[in-house]
Amino acid sequence: MAQQYQPGQRWISDSEAELGLGTILAQDGRLLTVLYPATGDTRQYSLRNAPLTRVRFSPGDQITHFEGWKLTVREVEDIDGLMVYHGLDGQNQPRTLPETQLSNFIQFRLASDRLFAGQIDPLSWFSLRYNTLQHTSKQMQSALWGLGGCRAQPIAHQLHIAREVADRSAPRVLLADEVGLGKTIEAGLVIHRQLLSGRANRVLILVPENLQHQWLVEMRRRFNLQVALFDAERFIESDASNPFEDAQLALVALEWLVDDEKAQDALFAAGWDLMVVDEAHHLVWHEDQASTEYSLVEQLAQVIPGVLLLTATPEQLGQDSHFARLRLLDPNRFHDLAAFRAESEHYRPVAEAVQELLDEGRLSPKAHATIQGFLGAEGEALLAAVNDGDTQASARLIRELLDRHGTGRVLFRNTRAAIQGFPERQLHPYPLATPEQYRDLPAGEHAELYPEVAFQAQGEAADDERWWRFDPRVDWLIDTLKMLKRTKVLVICAHAETAMDLEDALRVRSGIPASVFHEGMSILERDRAAAYFADEEFGAQVLICSEIGSEGRNFQFAHHLVMFDLPAHPDLLEQRIGRLDRIGQKHTIQLHIPYLQDSPQERLFQWYHEGLNAFLNTCPTGNALQHQFGPRLLPLLEGGESKAWDALVADARGERERLEAELHTGRDRLLELNSGGAGEGQALVEDILEQDDQFALPIYMETLFDAFGIDSEDHSENALILKPSEKMLDASFPLGDDEGVTITYDRAQALSREDMQFLTWEHPMVQGGMDLVLSGSMGNTAVALIKNKALKPGTVLLELLFVSEVVAPRSLQLGRYLPPAALRCLLDANGNDLASRVAFETLNDQLESVPRASANKFVQAQRDVLAKRISGGEEKILPIHVERVAEAQRRLAAEADEELARLVALQAVNPSVRDSEIDALRKQREDGLAMLEKAALRLEAIRVLVAG
């Protein structure tokens, strides 16, 4: 029968519930006009199939007048098609409320309200809501939360440091890993995990200007963190009173900040939870004087609770330098340089004893005495067990020593010597004759090392006279690429102009498909170039990069590197090799170095190879040697006697060997063990790889995309293209691009194809989609037909989903103890709960959809019965909720008490444990227990099942 519409009646939109209560204005022929006063919107619907549900309240319901007072309904009267509600107001006085005077802002979000208002959702949405709750609960309890979503190969020492640091309240640490071990990834993991956990909300990243772009790329590509890059132009053009306050994550160049006092004032006023400083070894400090940069960072460190300093300076080459960094972290603890040196010497024999235990599996009398003197009477039983060959006791002893290590909690330093998994390197030098065209170039830096740039700078050359027509390195490159055939080859040169010219040369002279990559391209253009290079089937054989353009990129799927020229500094040389030489590289790195004979290029090659040994091994001493020998090196590169040159190379080699020996003998094995995680990181790696192999996420996301009207189609193996369809349900779905995106769930694919989104449980698209499901009301009601021969036709089952949760600041981490969990109840006609006997999936497979009109009619007919059974379901679930809360309180108290006891005991023997850290943990314990006391049980969803 057709609906009867009367002006003044209140109806609610089935598709736009957020509009609030609608009022019928007019019925004109086949059109129905409805006003939604809450938003001021007017809608016209076809009279035959208007997506509207009549608003009818029942005795017991509480309703609101547009002036704000509430009425508890006792009786409902229908007068000429309009409802009039009679009942008691807040003062228990009898009152009447016609439906025309109902509040316009009433929304039916509660499951029971929506069910009885006729807002019944598709079965698929009910399942989606249930699965979303289950996955949310599981992820909040996961030890991998914030660690597994990074677009990087999981590496043990990085994961250990990230977890150790990110799980502290306001961490203040120095990350001093050797070059190539991934300090930027470690910092990104810490930032990401702190943000997800709520321990930090606003992060300031200070970097040298030349590394701003690298950080921007790393944070966005690896962690999906939207970092705001600040410079003078952005700061001046901003309309905000304080431009920094609008950015959750700000990336700032230290050079600009030092010169701009206005920007400094704004930065201090903005308020930050965590500060990250890269290249911290460039902050100059001496006992009698500090640089402007150091002083600025020092002032910021005094007002920002969390501080992360990144430095590449080897400790033994700069103990004073490390002290300067540690001073920034904890000036009370590190106040005296002489005392710091003495303390470091105090730990050296202990570290040597630990090394002996690791190498020999037992302790010599001397090592035993050293450790006994260090631990005192407390360590005697442990040492006795170690001497008896107890391997577990050995592990406990090492952990005890690590805990007491002077800087073990604030300083992390991993070395290549201690970390396994790096590839070997092979060097292939190619001396080539210097062409005549380069011999008479005007003097200058370009002419010395980059003659092609100097040649081009002389003026526009005819096409047949361009430098790549006569430079023998180009002929060599073409021949080498042909010899390597389909093998991927990365070519790096110093300048963007050279990279673009080489692409022209390869196209014109050989037809070899090449992709180019330089700083003049946008990030999107670089992504496309990198993707073209990475494509195994149809991609380019060669990618030609400029020095700056390749910063922060990872091309470890290739293992042939051509250096078309050599950089002027060993750090840049290591950065070039580091594009391929990473943990996880499966092949030996092949380094191809063409150079022009009898030129500065030849001498620079000899300097790096014979003096610094920088091609075949990492060169931690390179920066110091370049600084020490620079005054002799530069004049001799341009020319000069071969005898003087040979002497310089020999001197540099001798000094390098001396420094390397000093580094080796001075290795702090205790520090390395602590930084590497002593096996804990490897367990995290295995857990992440196991999670990667599961299909739960792709299966869940497919249902999510279907629900929101996102079309997916195959792109290639392990990759999908997502596009919004015409039926897209919610324009706010975080697809990332209105035109569509390409995604992969495969980590290896994501590492080689940076143009693809790497979907994990932590990805903004996944998290945003789940938030849309749980924050909306869609899916919290359903009615279905159940096909089961064991059930008598007409039998009604009621499935209820309750959520047991605590609403609290994320920083308290209560989701670890009481994650929002869906507590399911399946009631039969006698009130028995069958949920433990009938799994959700089993039940789901037996259900069929019911037309909405029929479902609504059935619900209205059974309203009183259903309302009683809903109350009965809550009574059955409440004891489970109460026990969950009690268990959460017990776990929180036990964990916090154990950690507090450890820190208090540790503080007695290791002053690096700050009072503020212990106080913060005590407060977190108290606040957490208080918030758990307020945990609530909420009816999340209702499904009515009728046997047929």
Swiss-Prot record:
The family database entries (Gene3D superfamilies) matched by this protein are listed as: 2.30.30.140, 2.30.30.930, 3.30.360.80, 6.10.140.1500, 6.10.140.2230, P-loop containing nucleotide triphosphate hydrolases, Tandem AAA-ATPase domain
Q: What is a GO molecular function of this protein?
A: helicase activity
Task: Output one GO BP term.
Answer: regulation of DNA-templated transcription
What the entry lists under PROSITE patterns is as follows: HELICASE_ATP_BIND_1, HELICASE_CTER
- KW DNA-binding (keyword) present: yes
Looking at the keywords, is Hydrolase present? yes
Q: Which residues bind ATP?
A: 177-184
As annotated in the record, motif DEAH box runs over 278-281
Which EC class heads this enzyme's classification?
Answer: hydrolase
Helicase C-terminal domain mapped to chain residues: 473-627
* Superkingdom to which the source organism belongs: Bacteria
Query: What keywords are assigned to this protein?
Result: Activator, ATP-binding, DNA-binding, Helicase, Hydrolase, Nucleotide-binding, Transcription, Transcription regulation
EC annotation from Swiss-Prot or TrEMBL: 3.6.4.-
Its biological purpose is as follows: Transcription regulator that activates transcription by stimulating RNA polymerase (RNAP) recycling in case of stress conditions such as supercoiled DNA or high salt concentrations. Probably acts by releasing the RNAP, when it is trapped or immobilized on tightly supercoiled DNA. Does not activate transcription on linear DNA. Probably not involved in DNA repair.
Q: Which family does it belong to?
A: Belongs to the SNF2/RAD54 helicase family. RapA subfamily.
Q: What is this protein called?
A: RNA polymerase-associated protein RapA
